[in-house]
Amino acid sequence: MRNYDTPVRAIRHKVYVEVAKAGFESTDETLIHDIEAIPYNIVEEKAKYRESIYRERAVASERVRLAMGLSLRPENKAVHLTDGLAASNIDEKYYEPPLMQVIPSACAACPPNKYIVSNMCRGCVAHPCMQACPKGAISMKDGKSYIDQDKCIKCGKCKAACPYDAISHNIRPCEQACGVKAIGSDEQGRASILEDKCVSCGMCMVSCPFGAISDKSQIFQLAHALRGGEKIIAIIAPAYISQFGDDVTPGKFKTALQVLGFSDVHEVAFGADVGAIAEAHHYAEKVATGELPFLLTSCCPSWSMMEKKFFPTMIDNISQELTPMVATARKVKQEQPDAKVVFVGPCASKKLEAMRRTVRSDVDFVLTFEELDAMFDAREIDPASFEEDGSLHDATAAGRGYAVAGGVAGAIEACLKEYYPDVPVHIEHAESLAECKKVLALAKAGKLKGCMIEGMACPGGCMGGAGTNVPVAKSSKELKKFLAGCTKKLPPKELVDIELN
């Protein structure tokens, strides 16, 4: 189970806080010095987690670069920590691909997929492990079972057969978390990301016990822009419920964002309402009539990327409706064309969606809840400390429910039943990339005809995204309570005619 209260997250938080402070406070004269000081502020006098203070500072230095949107430095030549700083010292979006990177000095080169016999082996007479192995890879050595790794095919039958649970399955946590098999190894046995397969969901990042994988952040550039007093509007994903403390209501959260420097705050759930109505209409017009065999949702960018990379023949079945982020951003910019828009959410891969040619002008920055929490700390803002002052009233329970696995399909289904009662509805949904691949394989095989298929890359949906602050079970429970209290349950049918192009 994913753990949120770990030293890895604490270190990431410290880095984000320090980088945010630099964006808010450093001058052109002090910036280089302030950035160079961050690894020393984080790792002071003694190494806590690695063999030396020098290695810990080396890792911290790479984290600082990624937090500023810069790429890792090469290992085979000397490159200064602040190399490239001039290009990233701006008040607008900055991004050097790729989004996800493995920090080599942080990676422990964990053993790859392997079954091994532990000291729990009793050397029993029956040898059920030997009998179960289809390749004859198990023999007896010094009175214990021994697995020949050259013969082993990693089927796991020996482990299942052992009555003492003496055979363990070692697999890299990052590799185990990746549902598209995008984790490989470099020449030194360290993890590497296969860019042709990676869909940037971030599950490898949050699963690595060494914190060796990280995404790039726009926290520095956004702090720079907020400091400059620009008109910047936050659009917040519906998964924000409970992310900043049990006592932080929507009204308090809105106030905290305004104190941080945002001129206004809107719910991305508005765009989800627009999408739910539009996709219900699309389903009724195209899928229910047989014109399309099935329809795939498009709000999760990692799910959409997976379809395009692994199931390219199914691209025409992906919904062409605007994602909630884009629909909300366009609505804001229609009304306030001079404003910059910041998407605040649980998702790492939204950073890539915002870099698409067709989206780049709509969304100026993408910030995760984890990064926003660090920005609050950098400015000593406690969202729970504010008085209740207004709230957020942009959306319905249907749109707000997009945050949980099954919520997208559920909202579309509810709209179909309300506004297209004569149309039969068939819904499928999958959460985690491994499950998403399975459901797409079924669709490709023609076994899901007439279905609206929702896919979420992260277990639990957006509530379990890589940039969240709270365990998915807790946050989903709080969201359910919040939805139950919503007065507006479904978006009006007229939203299908809204112009956001």
Segments from the language model and where they lie:
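Acidic, serine/threonine-rich, charge-biased low-complexity segments
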Residues: 74-83, 93-94
